[in-house]
């Protein structure tokens, strides 16, 4: 657990500079003062106050709105308020109203003030990225298994409702401890996903699945890939899946780095896709197809963890197991 004296701005990590939301014609990223259609942090704080809350601490804003730790005067419990005036904030709130699962963020309330929507959310101790940073070391297999199993349970629930999260990463996984884990931030989620299609670019480059980066058709299996990257990061911290220390320049460069780092074999590329036609030339034959990735094998990770990472990071999404299928693997002991 994190030290109780650590302030929230440390317990909650920054939004990645490489977060992308490009769905249709929109494009949002970063934390500029007008990144929510002109809703400044000061204006959002006034909305929070007008709604009867006391702002305790601003958190790093994302592409979908301003975020604060707050509480109602006279109440001890704190909450996280997400304030935005883009349609996506309202849509996220409407989606959260439909959800009820222990491993998916439960919205307490949705409020409106003029054109702005305010989501009242639980205040967790920290996010997984910050938890790993404060530990300054990887988790053991027991703790990593607890975290990723909870994430997979949340994903299985969402996928059963035909909801695709599209931004599974350590920053969007919230916890009190490794036994109390919740998947949050559904601002990039897509509903009514019945079959693979190109639903636009969304999420974060470093955790995007290859089919997203290649702009191919995709479905809920992209969330399994993101969870696989998270599992790698929890077991191999501070190493990254590509071995690079700098953020990806763009999606295509990250995809090339990924193919090379994992040692993806040409036979593992899905047929009749842009992924194969445009990127198979970066593959190698030094590794047998459908065996453990070179990048993972070199690190000496726990055998169970290495197996799960390989399955979740199966390059061809058709071969990649679903969250439900992984949860039914016989190796779970946590």
Swiss-Prot record:
Coiled-coil region list: none
Protein kinase domain location: 53-333
Residues the entry annotates as binding ATP: 59-67, 82
Chloroplast listed as a keyword: no
Highest rank taxon of the organism: Viruses
Gene Ontology biological process terms from the UniProt entry: regulation of G2/M transition of mitotic cell cycle; regulation of gene expression; signal transduction
Residues the record marks as active site: 167 (proton acceptor)
SUPFAM superfamilies membership: Protein kinase-like (PK-like)
Enzyme class, first EC level, given as a word: transferase
Record keywords: ATP-binding, Kinase, Nucleotide-binding, Serine/threonine-protein kinase, Transferase
UniProt entry tagged with the keyword ATP-binding: yes
General function of this protein: Able to phosphorylate in vitro the major virion phosphoprotein phosphorylated in vivo.
Stated family: Belongs to the protein kinase superfamily. Ser/Thr protein kinase family.
Full protein name: Serine/threonine-protein kinase
């Amino acid at each position: 657990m994190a030290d109780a004296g650590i302030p929230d701005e440390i317990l909650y990590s920054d939004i990645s500079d490489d977060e992308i939301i490009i769905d249709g014609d929109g494009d949002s990223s970063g934390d500029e003062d007008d990144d929510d259609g002109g809703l400044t942090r000061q204006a959002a704080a006034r909305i929070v106050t007008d709604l009867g809350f006391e702002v305790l601490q601003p958190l790093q804003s994302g592409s979908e709105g301003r975020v604060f730790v707050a509480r109602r005067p006279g109440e001890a419990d704190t909450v996280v308020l997400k304030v935005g005036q883009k349609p996506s904030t309202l849509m996220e709130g409407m989606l959260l109203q439909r959800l009820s699962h222990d491993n998916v963020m439960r919205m307490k309330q949705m409020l409106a003030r003029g054109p702005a929507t305010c989501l009242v959310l639980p205040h967790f101790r920290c996010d997984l990225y910050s938890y790993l940073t404060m530990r300054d070391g990887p988790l053991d297999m027991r703790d990593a298994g607890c975290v990723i199993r909870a994430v997979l349970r949340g994903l299985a629930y969402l996928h059963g409702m035909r909801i695709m999260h599209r931004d599974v990463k350590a920053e969007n996984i919230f916890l009190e401890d490794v036994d109390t884990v919740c998947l949050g931030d559904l601002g990039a989620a897509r509903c009514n996903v019945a079959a693979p299609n190109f639903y636009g670019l969304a999420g974060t480059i470093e955790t995007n699945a290859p089919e997203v980066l290649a702009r191919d058709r995709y479905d809920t299996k992209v969330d399994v890939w993101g969870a696989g990257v998270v599992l790698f990061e929890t077991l191999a911290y501070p190493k990254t899946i590509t071995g690079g220390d700098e953020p990806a320049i763009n999606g295509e460069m990250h995809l090339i780095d990924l193919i090379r780092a994992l040692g993806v074999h040409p036979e593992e590329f899905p047929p009749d896709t842009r992924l194969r036609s445009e990127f198979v030339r970066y593959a190698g034959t030094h590794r047998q197809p459908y065996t453990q990735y070179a990048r993972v094998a070199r690190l000496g990770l726990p055998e169970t963890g290495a197996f799960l990472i390989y399955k979740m990071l199966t390059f061809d999404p058709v071969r990649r197991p679903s969250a439900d299928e992984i949860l039914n693997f016989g190796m779970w002991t946590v």
